[in-house]
Amino acid sequence: MKKFQSMMAVVLVALMAFAVQSCGSDDDNNQQYKLTVTLDITDKGPLTDAQCDAMRSDAQKGSTVADHPTDASAETATMRAAQAISEALVLYKDTYGSAKFTYTLVCTKVSGNKQIITYYVEYNAGSINTYNNKNAK
């Protein structure tokens, strides 16, 4: 379990660095974004390949740039981070197995109109629930 926790910590640091870099700034309109990634995995049992594939597919659907074309950088960063985390979860499945996890991505524009993009995936006991909420404030 310690090896699992240390590996998860290393991957989380790498994902955070990736996410912050991806969601750094939008050169087109000089908007700054902040991306927060939260990942929680409980080691309970193996995911099937089909479940991992479904999770990856859901993560790839996390970007709907057409809904907010001016926020394309935030949308793209959110999708890329979701894909990166999904790949990491597949690695955990191959190495340790996991039956319950959740992760949340939040990308917030910190100048101009607030645009909060939240992508949330929950896998628990054989079912996958996905939420992709966008709230303009």
Task: Name each model feature, range by range.
Residues 35-39, 103-107, 119-121:
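Hydrophobic beta-strand residues in large extracellular and virion-surface proteins
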Residues 39-43, 109-111, 125:
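Beta-strand elements of well-folded, non-transmembrane domains
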Residues 121-137:
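Short, low-complexity, Pro/Ser/Thr/Gly-rich segments in the mature regions of secreted, periplasmic
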Residues 41-83:
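Post-signal-peptide N-terminal segment of Sec-exported extracytoplasmic proteins
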Residues 16-40:
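Bacterial Sec-dependent N-terminal signal peptides
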Residues 96-114:
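A short amphipathic beta-strand at an alpha->beta junction
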Residues 74-98:
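A short, charged, amphipathic alpha-helix used as a generic interaction element across diverse proteins
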Residues 1-22:
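Sec-dependent bacterial lipoprotein signal peptides
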